[in-house]
Amino acid sequence: MGNTFGHLFRVTTFGESHGGGVGVVIDGCPPLLEISQAEIQAELDRRRPGQSRITTPRQETDTCEILSGVFEGKTLGTPIAILVRNKDTRPQDYQEMAQVYRPSHADATYDAKYGIRNWQGGGRSSARETIGRVAAGAIAKKILQQVAGVEIIAYVRRIKDLEAPIDPNTVTMEQVESNIVRCPHPDYAEKMIALIDQVRRDANSIGGVVECVARNVPKGLGSPVFDKLEADLAKGVMSLPATKGFEIGSGFAGTLLTGQEHNDEFYSENGDIRTVTNRSGGVQGGISNGENIIIRAAFKPTATIGQAQRTVNQAGESTILAAKGRHDPCVLPRAVPMVEAMVALVLCDHLLRDRAQCHLLT
C-alpha cells in the first residue's frame, strides 16, 4: 500500500535503509528508448550520501544494476527492475532507537500504524527509499527530453533565512552543479555552505526550499478535476521525505495581489498563445499552458540530530535522546535530484496519458 506512483508510467519502490538493498520496478515505459546504466548512475551520483562535507558521511557508491526490461541498450516495453545494494550499513548505531522514538521522525507513527517497524536507520521512511525514484526519474527525463525537449532543473533557493535571488527562466544545470550546496548563486552558495558547516558542528540541522523549473513542457498535460497537473506535482513532491510545503507559480505570495495584478495576460507570438507574466507557474485550470512550470518545495530540518531532546520510549516513559548514526545536517543539497525526479515522473505519466486520450485520432 502506498508504494506505487503513477497511472501509465508506474513506479514501485522497495527496500529499506539498512537492509540488503533498495530499488524500483518501472512499468509502462515505452519500448525502444535508448538508456544506459551510466545515464541512470549519473543521477544517482547526484543523490548519493557522502558526496561532500555538508552531507551525511555514510559512504555508499549507490551503484545500480539493471535487472530486467532493457536489452542491448534499449527498453523492451516490459517492467524495468533496478537494484542498488546497501554496502555501508551500521545497524548497531540505531540500537537505542529500537525502543525510543526520535522527535519529529516516523518512528512513533509507524509503530502506531503497523505495530512493528524497522528501527535500523528508519527503514522504509529513510531517504534511501528515494534511490528508486531517482533511478526511475532518469528514465522519465530521457523520455521527456527525447519526445518533447523538456528540461528539468532544480536547485537550492533558500537555506534557513538565506534566500538567493535566482531567475528560474535562465538558470543552468552547470550553475547548479558548480558547488556542493547546489545553489546556482555563487555568493549565496558560500554563505549557505558556511551555515551548514556550523550547524553540523553543533550537532543540529536546518531546512530550506528547493525550487524547480520544467521548460518546454507541452501544452495540454493534466486533467480536470481530480487529476490536475499541479495536484499531481504536489502529491509527488510532497511524498518525498522531510517535505512540509509546496508552491507553484506565485504560490502563497499570490494571495497578496489583486486579480488585476495576478492575472497572466495573453498575447500571440507567431500564432502561439503565450502569457506576458507567469504567476500561474505554467499551469492553468490544472492543465499545462506551455510556459515554464515553476514549483517550490519546503524541506524541514533533518529530524535526527545529535543534540539531547526529550522523548518517550515504547512504554510511554519519558527519556532523553541524543541520536547516534550518520545523518545530513541539511537535506537540501541531496534533495535537488529527488525533486527533479518526482517532477519528471509526474510529467512523463501525464505525457503518456495525454497522448493516449487526446491524440489517438489526430
UniProtKB/Swiss-Prot annotation:
<keyword id="KW-0456">Lyase</keyword>
<dbReference type="GO" id="GO:0005829">
    <property type="term" value="C:cytosol"/>
</dbReference>
<dbReference type="InterPro" id="IPR020541">
    <property type="entry name" value="Chorismate_synthase_CS"/>
</dbReference>
<dbReference type="InterPro" id="IPR035904">
    <property type="entry name" value="Chorismate_synth_AroC_sf"/>
</dbReference>
<feature type="binding site">
    <location>
        <position position="285"/>
    </location>
    <ligand>
        <name>FMN</name>
    </ligand>
</feature>
<dbReference type="GO" id="GO:0009423">
    <property type="term" value="P:chorismate biosynthetic process"/>
</dbReference>
<feature type="binding site">
    <location>
        <begin position="300"/>
        <end position="304"/>
    </location>
    <ligand>
        <name>FMN</name>
    </ligand>
</feature>
<feature type="binding site">
    <location>
        <position position="326"/>
    </location>
    <ligand>
        <name>FMN</name>
    </ligand>
</feature>
<comment type="subunit">
    <text>Homotetramer.</text>
</comment>
<dbReference type="GO" id="GO:0004107">
    <property type="term" value="F:chorismate synthase activity"/>
</dbReference>
<keyword id="KW-0288">FMN</keyword>
<keyword id="KW-0028">Amino-acid biosynthesis</keyword>
<dbReference type="GO" id="GO:0010181">
    <property type="term" value="F:FMN binding"/>
</dbReference>
<keyword id="KW-0057">Aromatic amino acid biosynthesis</keyword>
<comment type="pathway">
    <text>Metabolic intermediate biosynthesis; chorismate biosynthesis; chorismate from D-erythrose 4-phosphate and phosphoenolpyruvate: step 7/7.</text>
</comment>
<keyword id="KW-0285">Flavoprotein</keyword>
<keyword id="KW-0274">FAD</keyword>
<comment type="similarity">
    <text>Belongs to the chorismate synthase family.</text>
</comment>
<feature type="binding site">
    <location>
        <begin position="124"/>
        <end position="126"/>
    </location>
    <ligand>
        <name>FMN</name>
    </ligand>
</feature>
<comment type="function">
    <text>This reaction introduces a second double bond into the aromatic ring system.</text>
</comment>
<feature type="binding site">
    <location>
        <position position="47"/>
    </location>
    <ligand>
        <name>NADP(+)</name>
    </ligand>
</feature>
<dbReference type="GO" id="GO:0008652">
    <property type="term" value="P:amino acid biosynthetic process"/>
</dbReference>
<keyword id="KW-0521">NADP</keyword>
<dbReference type="Pfam" id="PF01264">
    <property type="entry name" value="Chorismate_synt"/>
</dbReference>
<protein>
    <recommendedName>
        <fullName>Chorismate synthase</fullName>
        <ecNumber>4.2.3.5</ecNumber>
    </recommendedName>
</protein>
<dbReference type="GO" id="GO:0009073">
    <property type="term" value="P:aromatic amino acid family biosynthetic process"/>
</dbReference>
<dbReference type="InterPro" id="IPR000453">
    <property type="entry name" value="Chorismate_synth"/>
</dbReference>
<feature type="binding site">
    <location>
        <position position="53"/>
    </location>
    <ligand>
        <name>NADP(+)</name>
    </ligand>
</feature>
